[in-house]
Amino acid sequence: MREPLEDIQLRSESWKPEEVLRWAFATFGDDVAMATGFGVEGMALIDIASRINPNVQVFTGDTDFLFPETYDLIDRVEKRYGIKIERLYSAVTPEEQEMEHGPELWKRNPDRCCGIRKVEPLKNKLAGLRAWITAIRRDQTSARAYARKIEWDIKFQLVKINPLADWSAPMVWSYIHKHNVPYNPMHDRDYPSIGCTHCTRAVKPGEDSRAGRWAGFQKTECGLHAGNKSARIPLVHLEVPLGVSQSVTADET
C-alpha cells in the first residue's frame, strides 16, 4: 500500500503522540531514529517512545561544549530506559576549529559554529535513515510554527516526525511530573532552553523561552529545523504497511 505524504499529514494531525510513534515504528522499522538535545520536550518524548518501543534508537549531537548537567542527564536516561544514546561528534575537534577559524568562533559566527559542531554530524546521520523523530513544538519559534506531526524534511530529504507538534509547555511539564520523568535541573534555574555552555544563559523575567540562546544575535535555531511552511509535498515512494494507519491506538498520557 502506498499513500501520499500529504494524506498522512492531514490524518495524523488528530493523532496523539503515541499514535504518531506507532505509525513511525511500524512504517520505518530500524530506519527511523529519534534526535534529542535532552530538553524537557525530548525527555517526555523519550519516555513515551520507550513505552511503545523499548529498543527505540536515540541520538544526540555532542558538540563537546555541553553543560555537565546535560552529560549527567544522558547517563541517567541510559540507566533508566536501558538504551544506549548514540552521540554524534563533529569531524573537527575544538582545537582544530580554533586553529582554522580562530578562538571563540561562537562569539563571531554562531551559525558557522553550529554548522560545524551540530548540523554536519546530523546531516551525516540522517543520510542513513528514512525518517527521523523530533520533539519540536509549533509554539516554540516562528521557524517551527508550521511543523506538522508528519512531514517531508526539505532540508535533509527524509520524513520528519514531530509527535509533540501541537503540545504546549504546560502539557509537557504535566507529563513530566505525572510520569516522574527525569529532566535537566537547569530548567529549575531559569534555563528553559539549554544548548552549549558558550551560547546559553538564564532567561530573565518576561523574556521569551529561547531568549537565552545565542543572546545578542538574531538567531533562534541551530540550523537543524528548517521551516516547512508548505509541507504538502507528496511522498510517492512511502510504503505504509496495510492497516497500520487505521489500527494505531493511544495510551493514556
Where do the language-model regions lie?
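Nucleotide-activated chemistry modules centered on ATP-dependent adenylation/adenylyltransferase
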Residues: 1-253
